């Protein structure tokens, strides 16, 4: 399923796909991605692919992953924190040696700017009405219903697509504010929204984020819980498909939530789910962690 095999003839109308497969955090693991597509017998003329963010970094082949995904017909992509990090590095808003990463090939690629432009036009949330499913990288904070979450995600998309996207990205990193208030404005408002959708694991009932803890669900700090334990599945009435939290190993304790990060970049496996049947597919990691 090499990217070069996807041509204009194959980019069929996927308004009514046979199957929609959503794949967990790829993080530059191109080889495993191709093996997973072989396992599910992916047909680009009949099936649609989606990804819950963190397409790049940690694995060895982020450039190949981006080029392949860009070649697909209308993939369902949401951004993760590592994807935003690539945008910040790629546009020269942070020194390349600020943190360890495996993004050097992307940063030196002749088509770097084309890939960055394509990436920054991806949203933080995708709502697939026909499948009653929401795709998001980290999760949905409890104080927002589905409609509100989609509207807040649009604020980030507007900033990323707008003329001042560099200023937005330059000031994106940070843990504060960690508490949502309706009167938040400017960069503080955008940073909270972005952190909630791309970095959140634990929070309290009002959406106060704990961005320091990364462990299993039983390791939550006092008064905090995994975000999905606060949500009401009857109220949401949709499946929430997410990644980001490798320590969950693809397991979520709440109904209608589907965790897909199974730690491929850490040496474990890459996982996909068929949104129609909820059947899961996984392949083991073959790529050694490069950082």
From Swiss-Prot:
<comment type="similarity">
    <text>Belongs to the Ap4A hydrolase family.</text>
</comment>
<dbReference type="GO" id="GO:0008803">
    <property type="term" value="F:bis(5'-nucleosyl)-tetraphosphatase (symmetrical) activity"/>
</dbReference>
<dbReference type="Pfam" id="PF00149">
    <property type="entry name" value="Metallophos"/>
</dbReference>
<dbReference type="GO" id="GO:0016791">
    <property type="term" value="F:phosphatase activity"/>
</dbReference>
<dbReference type="GO" id="GO:0005737">
    <property type="term" value="C:cytoplasm"/>
</dbReference>
<keyword id="KW-0378">Hydrolase</keyword>
<dbReference type="InterPro" id="IPR004843">
    <property type="entry name" value="Calcineurin-like_PHP_ApaH"/>
</dbReference>
<dbReference type="InterPro" id="IPR004617">
    <property type="entry name" value="ApaH"/>
</dbReference>
<dbReference type="GO" id="GO:0110154">
    <property type="term" value="P:RNA decapping"/>
</dbReference>
<protein>
    <recommendedName>
        <fullName>Bis(5'-nucleosyl)-tetraphosphatase, symmetrical</fullName>
        <ecNumber>3.6.1.41</ecNumber>
    </recommendedName>
</protein>
<dbReference type="InterPro" id="IPR029052">
    <property type="entry name" value="Metallo-depent_PP-like"/>
</dbReference>
<comment type="function">
    <text>Hydrolyzes diadenosine 5',5'''-P1,P4-tetraphosphate to yield ADP.</text>
</comment>
């Amino acid at each position: 399923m090499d990217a070069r095999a996807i041509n204009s003839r194959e980019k069929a109308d996927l308004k009514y796909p046979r199957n929609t497969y959503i794949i967990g955090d790829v993080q530059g693991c191109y080889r495993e991605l191709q093996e997973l597509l072989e396992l599910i017998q992916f047909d680009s003329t009949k099936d649609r692919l989606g990804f819950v963010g963190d397409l790049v970094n940690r694995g060895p082949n982020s450039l190949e992953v981006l080029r392949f995904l860009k070649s697909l017909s209308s993939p369902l992509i949401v951004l993760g924190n590592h994807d935003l990090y690539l945008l910040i590095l790629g546009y020269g808003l942070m020194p390349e040696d600020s943190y360890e990463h495996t993004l050097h090939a992307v940063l030196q690629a002749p088509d770097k700017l084309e890939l960055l432009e394509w990436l920054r036009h991806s949203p933080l949330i995708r709502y697939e009405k026909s499948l009653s499913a929401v795709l998001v990288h980290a999760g949905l904070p409890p104080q927002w219903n589905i409609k509100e979450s989609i509207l807040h995600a649009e604020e980030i998309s507007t900033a990323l697509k707008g003329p001042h996207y560099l200023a937005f990205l330059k000031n994106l990193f940070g843990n504060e504010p960690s508490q949502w208030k309706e009167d938040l404005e400017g960069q503080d408002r955008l940073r909270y929204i972005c952190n909630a959708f791309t970095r959140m694991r634990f929070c309290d009932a009002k959406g106060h984020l704990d961005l320091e803890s990364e462990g299993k669900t039983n390791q939550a700090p006092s008064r905090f819980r995994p975000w999905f334990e606060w949500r009401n599945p009857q109220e949401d009435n949709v499946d929430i498909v997410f990644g980001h939290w490798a320590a969950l190993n693809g397991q979520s304790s709440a109904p209608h939530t589907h965790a897909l990060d199974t730690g491929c970049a850490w040496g474990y496996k890459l996982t996909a789910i068929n949104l129609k049947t909820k059947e899961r597919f996984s392949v083991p990691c073959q790529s050694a962690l490069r950082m």
